A protein has these predicted regions:
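Short, acidic/polar
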Residues: 107-120, 174-179
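N-terminal metal-binding scaffold of metallo-dependent hydrolase/deaminase domains
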Residues: 1-47, 60-61
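A short, small-residue-rich loop immediately preceding and capping a beta-strand
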Residues: 105-109, 128-136
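Histidine-centered catalytic micro-motifs
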Residues: 63-75
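Divalent metal-coordination and catalytic microenvironments
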Residues: 12, 28, 33, 58, ...
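Active-site gating loops and adjacent loop-to-helix segments of metal-dependent hydrolytic enzymes
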Residues: 76-110, 167-168
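Metal-coordinating catalytic core of metallo-dependent amide/deamination hydrolases
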Residues: 138-199
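Short acidic/polar active-site loop segments enriched in Thr and Asp
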Residues: 127-128, 156
Length: 199
């Protein structure tokens, strides 16, 4: 039990983990940003009468969702006309995705997409994600542009650049360096981290 004032979050239902059933009338006590106590809402109110309480009738409290594979920049392709229907996956990549989306991305477009998708994730309950960016014309510091938005939104994000020689051998090397720079930029901790990603 933590000392000091806490915050009681009191929903109608608590889903704590997959091993236990949902619990009606249960909530949590938060102290210094961490869950300190889990139990029936009435018990929490009795045990911690001086804590601020947030009643949440009609609500469910549960851990955030995890999106383990996302390409946030892909949201920018919504509504771009293809001219004709792709005849397969490779024609889709070669005739549409690479020239119309990935090869045109710059920092401004990347940050707009990141902001948009982070907002959608938060609104849908996703709090943790792994993003793979592929935008050869945006190097260097494209991942740092993403990181700035993710940090401001308060999500836990793992950011990576798809290092590939699709555009050129030099682009592949720059992608590796981009990942290394992100890994180094996140060494001090925080909600954002980087990983090495190749394709």
């Amino acid at each position: 039990m933590g000392a000091g004032p806490g915050l009681l979050i009191q929903p109608d239902w608590l889903v704590a983990d997959a091993r236990n059933p949902p619990r009606a009338g249960w909530g949590v006590r938060v102290v210094n940003g961490l869950i300190d106590t889990v139990g029936p809402n009435s018990d929490l109110s009795d045990r911690y009468p001086d804590d601020e309480a947030i009643p949440a009738p009609g609500r469910i409290l549960m851990p955030g969702f995890v999106n383990s594979h996302v390409h946030m920049y892909g949201v920018l392709a919504h509504g771009i006309p293809t001219g004709s229907a792709p005849t397969g996956f490779w024609p889709f990549l070669e005739d549409f995705w690479w020239p119309q989306v990935e090869d045109r991305l710059d920092h401004e477009m990347i940050t707009a997409a990141t902001d948009w998708v982070c907002t959608e994730m938060l609104l849908s309950g996703t709090t943790t994600f792994l993003d793979i960016l592929e935008a050869p014309a945006s190097l260097p510091e494209a991942l740092l542009a993403e990181k700035d938005i993710v940090d401001r939104r308060g999500l836990r994000g793992v950011l990576s650049f798809e290092a590939t020689e699709r555009s050129s051998p030099e682009s592949g090397q720059m992608g590796l360096l981009e990942n290394l720079a992100m890994i180094d930029a996140c060494r001090d901790g925080g909600l954002t981290s980087g990983i090495m990603y190749t394709h």
